[in-house]
């Protein structure tokens, strides 16, 4: 299986090619056109398919791993001798489709038992988050850590919840200085990893392993905690149709959010 450094080099090359290919069609009806139904049973937009095809071609050329799981193509053979990659070719497809510059290539690499490398690049800005298991997390090569804020009153959090869930949160005392919902979960988890947000909470039950694999490793390697909203282990199956609820937060505030969630 490819080394983490080799994996990052391929991802860098792929990300540059994707950004160039998408640039003329981001924010256009052509790029946003739904052209097929993906393996996750949701519509695939043209820009997703273009990005996925670029990744598949490059990963096969470099034999990055044995298999790759993508929400568009499902599980496909790559040709390497070991390992599984988890791909979201355009995390934040809606943002890309309407021209909001917050969408990313997200790729996690597993040795078959655990994630060993994660790569998330904002395709609009080029900012790149990476992590290697046991080696820390980085943005554009600089080490990152979560914030140490522990009070809801001073924290900024990304929260995805339907009206009944949000109502229950508020009725049980949830407050936050700022709530953000930016539309690209991998990038938002990375924002927790580098201290721009204190927490990411998704209660919809729709987040899949392809959405989160890379960013979870990045957040954990940075020093944050990822769990179910109530604090238990969050385990994703290799199934693009199976979603989970998730809490990713700095260590100081994670327990407080999990305690609140157990009241719901």
Task: Describe these PLM feature segments.
Residues 1-90:
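N-terminal subdomain of lithium-sensitive/metallo-dependent phosphomonoesterases centered on the IMPase/IPPase/PAP
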Residues 8, 61, 146-264:
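An extended, acidic
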Residues 48, 92-93, 192, 219:
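Buried hydrophobic positions in well-ordered alpha/beta secondary-structure cores of metabolic enzymes
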Residues 67-71, 87, 96, 180-183, ...:
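General beta-strand structural signal in soluble alpha/beta enzymes
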Residues 70-72, 121, 160:
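Short His-Asn-centered micro-motif
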Residues 81-134, 152-153:
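DPxDG-like acidic metal-binding loop motif
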């Amino acid at each position: 299986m490819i080394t983490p450094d080799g994996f990052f080099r391929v991802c860098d090359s792929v990300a540059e090619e994707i950004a160039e290919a998408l640039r003329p069609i981001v924010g256009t009806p052509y790029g946003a056109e739904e052209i097929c139904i993906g393996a996750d049973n949701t519509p695939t937009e043209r820009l997703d398919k273009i990005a996925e095809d670029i990744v598949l071609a490059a990963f096969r050329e470099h034999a990055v791993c044995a298999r790759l799981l993508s929400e568009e193509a499902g599980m496909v053979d790559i040709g390497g001798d070991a390992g599984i990659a988890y791909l979201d070719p355009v995390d934040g497809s809606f943002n890309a489709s309407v021209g909001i510059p917050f969408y990313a290539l997200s790729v996690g690499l597993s040795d078959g038992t655990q994630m060993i490398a994660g790569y998330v690049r904002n395709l609009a800005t080029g900012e790149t988050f990476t992590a290697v298991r046991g080696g820390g997390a980085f943005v554009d090569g600089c080490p990152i850590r979560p914030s140490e804020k522990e009070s809801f009153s001073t924290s900024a959090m990304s929260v995805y919840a339907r009206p009944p869930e949000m109502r229950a949160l508020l009725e049980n005392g949830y407050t936050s200085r700022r709530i953000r919902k930016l539309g690209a979960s991998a990038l938002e988890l990375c924002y927790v990893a580098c201290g721009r947000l204190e927490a990411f909470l998704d209660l919809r039950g729709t987040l899949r392993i392809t959405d989160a694999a890379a960013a979870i490793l990045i957040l954990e390697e940075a020093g944050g905690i990822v769990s179910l909203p109530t604090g238990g282990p969050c385990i994703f199956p290799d199934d693009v149709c199976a979603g989970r609820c998730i809490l990713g937060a700095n260590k100081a505030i994670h327990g407080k959010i999990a305690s609140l969630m157990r009241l719901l």
